[in-house]
UniProtKB/Swiss-Prot annotation:
Prodomain residues: 424-446
Protein name: Probable glucan endo-1,3-beta-glucosidase eglC
Primary site of residence: membrane
A biological-process GO annotation: polysaccharide catabolic process
Glycosylation sites (chain numbering): 183, 364, 370
Residues bearing a lipid moiety (GPI-anchor amidated asparagine): 423
Organism (species): Aspergillus fumigatus (strain ATCC MYA-4609 / CBS 101355 / FGSC A1100 / Af293)
Catalysed reaction equations from the record: Hydrolysis of (1->3)-beta-D-glucosidic linkages in (1->3)-beta-D-glucans
EC number: 3.2.1.39
Function (record text): Glucanases play a role in cell expansion during growth, in cell-cell fusion during mating, and in spore release during sporulation. This enzyme may be involved in beta-glucan degradation and also function biosynthetically as a transglycosylase.
Family in the record: Belongs to the glycosyl hydrolase 17 family.
Biased composition (Low complexity): 401-416
Length: 446
């Protein structure tokens, strides 16, 4: 095999293994006004060029519908096409408007075709609907939810809708709080999904020790709980973050220093390893919510409020991050390998407090779980589960490639060049570094 062919194959393998890192984006601003294509495009461009990062080039959407319309496709799609930002599409599944979500999905496929298809990472049917439908969600006044049977029905409807279209290869999942995922009554939704979306916010876990020093452990443990029930399916981090300002939740203090610590300890190990959409790029335009999670302020800028660079000691190298945020391609999106947590954890995990944002921010409910499975309203003096924010804004996220390890067959015969290359690239999580190492190993075997 020629050297140029080896390099091309290595880079192709790295691209196909690369995960996605980006932010969550609602269809309105924080005052409820609808975002335009220009608004989305400005956000996507800013995310790609954030100082201290290799760029956040993926967007998670909550709805297919443009703000202020019945079922017109969201203008984030043409903005993403212009900016080459990959998309985790979302269909809002609570409140009885799903037919319009399907209509918008069909219209988007017809209007944008291949240009859309090459950007789609996956499709999320709903966001925290199961939590809002739970006893805890009802107690917390979290908003209208949906039962698991209906979510399964909606997932099947989306599968039928995209069958035979440009999006036929898109993996379909559902996003919810980890407490919803570990609830056995929701297991049918897990069965229906190709992947599980995890929302988790230790900041809101105000019935437990939730200082910034506890945050990483709380986050990791709640992810492990979700992994344990995922039945081998990938778990994508669809929402997490720490506020830069706002009220204190028990021991959790909202400030820039703690937001930076959470980014370093939780975000950096995810970036370049697991599909992750951070909350949030900007939530203070034009009104600053309490709490505010935006990593940029009220004025959109590529200069963040705190340092976003990840140190070399983090598990994600700059090279891996560069690979994970390269422009999307057909191989790395539809038909490519997704990247997420797949290893089920046997250890018990502490619960994590989680938050969801509805399309356009009309909902900002927050769910939590504790040993007594009780929920308390945050608007009261007692620590609670509802963030109570009416601000509308979209979230943010980051992503990375999933790690895979190749196993030895025990054969004494020399492995083939193609096997060395494939296994090396896979075992090194699809990073550019992994691709380079794979090439070197392949050349050594010649």
């Amino acid at each position: 095999m020629q050297f140029t062919h080896l390099v091309a194959l290595a880079l192709a393998l790295a691209t196909s293994e690369a995960a996605h890192q980006g932010f969550n984006y609602g269809n309105t601003k924080s005052d409820g006004s609808a975002k335009s294509q220009a608004d989305f495009q400005a956000e996507f461009s800013t995310a790609k060029n954030l100082v201290g990062t290799s760029g956040f080039t993926s967007a998670r959407l909550y709805t297919m519908i443009q703000g202020g319309t019945a079922n017109t496709p969201i203008s984030a799609i043409p903005a993403a096409i212009t900016e080459q930002t990959s998309l985790l599409l979302g269909l809002w599944a609570s409140g009885g408007n799903f037919a319009n979500e399907i209509a918008a999905l069909k219209a988007a496929i017809a209007q944008y075709g291949d240009d859309l298809a090459k950007l789609v990472v996956g499709i999320s049917v709903g966001s925290e609907d199961l939590y809002r439908n739970s006893v805890d969600g009802v107690k917390a006044n979290a908003g209208i939810g949906t039962n698991p049977d209906e979510i399964v029905s909606y997932i099947n409807e989306v599968r039928s809708t995209i069958a035979g279209t440009k999006l036929s290869g898109a993996p379909i999942g559902h996003v919810d709080t980890w407490t919803a995922w570990v609830n056995g009554s929701n297991s049918a939704v897990i069965d229906a999904c190709d992947w599980l979306g995890f929302d988790g916010y230790p900041y809101f876990q105000n019935t437990m020790a939730n200082s910034i020093s506890d945050a990483k452990a709380l986050f990791d443990e709640s992810v492990a709980k979700t992994q344990a029930v995922a039945k081998g399916k990938e778990v994508w981090i669809t929402e997490t973050g720490w506020p830069v300002s706002g009220k204190t939740e028990n021991l959790a203090v909202a400030n820039l220093a703690n937001a930076k610590t959470y980014w370093d300890e939780v975000g950096c190990p995810l970036f370049g390893k697991t599909n992750t959409w951070w909350y949030i790029l900007q939530d203070a335009d034009p009104v600053t919510p309490n709490p505010s999670f935006g990593i940029v302020g009220s004025t959109l800028s590529t200069t963040p409020l705190f340092d976003l660079s990840c140190s070399a000691s983090s598990s994600s190298s700059a090279a891996a991050a560069a690979s994970s945020t390269a422009g999307p391609s057909a191989s790395s999106v539809i038909g490519g390998k997704a990247s997420g947590f797949t290893t089920a954890a046997a250890n018990s995990a502490k619960p994590t407090f989680t938050v969801g944002k509805g399309p356009g921010g009309s909902y900002n409910g927050t769910g939590f779980w504790n040993s007594t499975s009780s929920a308390r309203p945050s608007s009261s003096a007692i620590s609670g589960s509802s963030s109570g924010s009416a601000a509308g804004s979209s979230g943010a996220g980051a992503s990375g490639a999933s790690g895979q390890s190749s196993s030895s067959t025990g054969s004494s015969s020399a492995p083939s060049t193609s096997n060395i290359l494939s296994n090396a690239a896979s075992g090194l999580s699809g990073s550019i570094f992994g691709a380079v190492v794979a090439v070197c190993l392949a050349l050594a075997a010649l």
